[in-house]
């Protein structure tokens, strides 16, 4: 295949395909964006009609059309609002979102994927956002309008994506897509399950979670070492969590970070922090820590139990 840049053609003649590894290493420095000196070669990648998955970006490109269509169909549960796809890669999912005739934007950090999408999906030109999703101000994405979040999410940031979703929950009534099976199980887990943890409680506080189906590694390039799963999360009717949400997050994270301890043991460090923040002498919470609920471990508490516990901790600190 003839290349569009004679300088790069010459370099390839000397270094062979190893040059691509050099380019990859350079791109690591810019989180998926090329150094300025290589910007002029962007069109070269467009001529290759392919994008090589990058491990440092957690890319595993979906190649099964049936799975892609099934994921695209999950957004139908929340009709009549725009769609934002995270990490479209080569557009395997995108191609099934576009015919739905809904305003669709994609956010992609990898410059090579962006170049490919511009070439293969010219109708997306104005709706390709070249950015890091985790750093975006989502209120500007659709002018403050609610939207569906979807994607074949990069495995290395999937949990971070859902924590960001929680921060923008008023704008995201529905979130669907594919993630590691382990993360999907954590999202959908109920009290008493080994998978039940921080993500389970904080997400289920605001969303109803559905584990839709499991996906085998062979439908990806490259195949991941783990199975994947498709999930759908739909905002529940809660308008308030019923407690101080910041304190709730601290209670949940503190206790699950010591999940093998009973609640009374895992809460002691939190009370020490709260006492210090309020300028109080540490200790003095023995009666509170003696209540029966705190003989349980965190995975035994429901979302409502954590809400009630947070309110009780707040009252204890006011006493």
Predicted regions and their residues:
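Residue-identity detector for glycine
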Residues: 13-18, 32
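Catalytic cores of RNA-modifying enzymes
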Residues: 31, 37-254, 299, 308-311, ...
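Ala/Thr-enriched low-complexity intrinsically disordered regions
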Residues: 2-4, 17, 37-41
């Amino acid at each position: 295949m003839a290349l569009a840049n004679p300088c790069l053609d010459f370099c390839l003649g000397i270094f062979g395909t190893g040059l691509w590894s050099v380019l990859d290493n350079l791109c690591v420095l810019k989180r998926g964006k090329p150094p300025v000196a290589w910007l002029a070669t962007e069109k070269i990648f467009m001529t290759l009609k392919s994008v090589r998955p990058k491990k440092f970006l957690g890319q595993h490109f979906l190649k099964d059309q049936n799975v892609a269509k099934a994921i695209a169909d999950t957004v139908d549960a929340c009709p009549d609002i725009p769609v934002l796809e995270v990490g479209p890669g080569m557009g395997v999912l995108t191609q099934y979102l576009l015919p739905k005739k809904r305003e669709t934007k994609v956010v992609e950090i990898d410059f090579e994927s962006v170049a490919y999408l511009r070439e293969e999906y010219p109708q997306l030109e104005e709706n390709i956002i070249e950015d890091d999703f985790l750093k975006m101000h989502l209120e500007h994405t659709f002018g403050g309008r609610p939207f569906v979040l979807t994607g074949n999410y990069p495995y290395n940031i999937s949990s971070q994506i859902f924590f960001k979703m929680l921060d923008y929950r008023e704008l995201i009534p529905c979130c669907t897509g594919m993630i590691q099976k382990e993360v999907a199980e954590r999202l959908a887990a109920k009290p008493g399950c080994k998978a039940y943890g921080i993500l389970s409680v904080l997400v289920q506080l605001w969303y109803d979670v559905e584990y839709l189906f499991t996906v085998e590694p062979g439908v990806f390039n490259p195949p991941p070492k783990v199975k994947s799963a498709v999930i759908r999360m739909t905002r529940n009717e809660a308008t308030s969590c019923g407690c101080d949400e910041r304190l709730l997050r601290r209670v949940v994270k503190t206790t699950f970070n010591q999940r093998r301890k009973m609640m009374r043991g895992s809460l002691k460090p939190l009370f020490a922090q709260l006492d210090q923040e309020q300028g109080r002498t540490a200790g003095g919470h023995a009666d509170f820590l003696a209540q029966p609920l705190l003989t349980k471990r965190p995975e035994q508490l429901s979302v409502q139990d954590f809400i009630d516990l947070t309110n009780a901790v707040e009252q204890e600190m006011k006493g």
